[in-house]
Amino acid sequence: MINKPNQFVNHLSALKKHFASYKELREAFNDYHKHNGDELTTFFLHQFDKVMELVKQKDFKTAQSRCEEELAAPYLPKPLVSFFQSLLQLVNHDLLEQQNAALASLPAAKIIELVLQDYPNKLNMIHYLLPKTKAFVKPHLLQRLQFVLTDSELLELKRFSFFQALNQIPGFQGEQVEYFNSKLKQKFTLTLGEFEIAQQPDAKAYFEQLITQIQQLFLKEPVNAEFANEIIDAFLVSYFPLHPPVPLAQLAAKIYEYVSQIVLNEAVNLKDELIKLIVHTLYEQLDRPVGDEN
């Protein structure tokens, strides 16, 4: 349901939209040059090769700057723009991978420093600790991160995602943390690594049964089921580590009703308390009030 926060969604493959490799791109440019070998095209082919040389040296940052300079040149012929744009995409991809590899190789304490810089805007960098073994992530480092889980000003989804990341770090498994749920206005003591999603036993059973009922209700509507699952995710986050104080069958039926109305572009009845709860729970994850579409 809730996707594990264990990937950096950089969409790296999407950056390689036009050409799969530098070689393929260079061959395409060379083929164009054979049929359009004017002086300006020859000049830019040389500039292209200079960037390629930087790529061979793995100096992707400089290569990125050079690509951007060539694209900004007022005399760059329009037919050549796509070659440099595609080259920039490939360079951006490799620069991002290079930066990620450099960050992942940092000591755990340094990664935690980066996580806490410009708080809370870099919390997602906690994921660089996930591949590290217990030998590299000592339990005492957790003390520096505990406050994030009890920060009442932090958006619930961010706090939940941060907890889920901590829950997967081998060096922190077995350690106890305090977790504050701002919706419930309660603190909970949770053990890291004990469960994939550290819910109370009755909450785990509640959501498993809710998922099953939703699957049955949307058996012939798989696309609508995806939206219904997003609603379940929102409830899981908002009430974590508990479950909503609503009879399971009633909530499943109302989720089905709400999704069906939205898909058909029908007005929803906000006077219905359960429908209202669904809407508010969804908006809680967006950190804006119901009706604020800006």
Swiss-Prot record:
Coiled coil: none
Xref: InterPro entries: DUF3196, Uncharacterised_MG237_central, Uncharacterised_MG237_N
Source domain of life: Bacteria
Protein's UniProt name: Uncharacterized protein MG237 homolog
Species annotation: Mycoplasma pneumoniae (strain ATCC 29342 / M129 / Subtype 1) (Mycoplasmoides pneumoniae)
